[in-house]
């Protein structure tokens, strides 16, 4: 199995894409990327991510926006409940003082399931959660 792990790591080093959400430990930015990329290819989601985080650089700016503006920045991505859930979760987090720090708290955010909570906690906080999506399960 050690050989498999080495092969997998080498493949990743040779094939990884340089994406902004892979260069940060900021849980907010990782959360935004994970939600945008649900049911969306990276090639399409990339520009939306850039525009969205430029306008809403943190949970407080997203929480302060009105829903119509959030929906305007989401327009074209589809699955609009994702944008509504982001906005509702941002308002909840802003009221609580910021982004949650535990898996249980992240999982409790509106629109966040086990995969997204694991991704945020693993990538942002270095917690030992496996980030396993439906493709891996299949």
Which positions does each model-derived feature cover?
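Short, low-complexity, intrinsically disordered N-terminal peptides in bacterial proteins
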Residues: 1-4
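Catalytic cores of DNA base-excision repair glycosylases
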Residues: 6-7, 11-138
């Amino acid at each position: 199995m050690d050989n498999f792990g080495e092969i997998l790591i080498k493949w990743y080093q040779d094939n990884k894409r340089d994406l902004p959400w892979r260069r940060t430990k900021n849980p907010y930015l990782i959360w935004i990327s994970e939600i945008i990329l649900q049911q969306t290819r990276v090639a399409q989601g990339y520009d939306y991510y850039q525009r969205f985080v430029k306008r809403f650089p943190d949970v407080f700016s997203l929480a302060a926006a009105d829903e119509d503006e959030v929906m305007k920045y989401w327009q074209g991505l589809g699955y609009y409940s994702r944008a509504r859930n982001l906005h509702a979760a941002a308002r909840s987090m802003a009221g609580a003082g910021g982004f949650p720090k535990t898996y249980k708290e992240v999982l409790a955010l509106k629109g966040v399931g086990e995969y997204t909570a694991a991704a945020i906690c693993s990538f942002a906080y270095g917690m030992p959660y496996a980030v396993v999506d439906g493709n891996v399960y299949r």
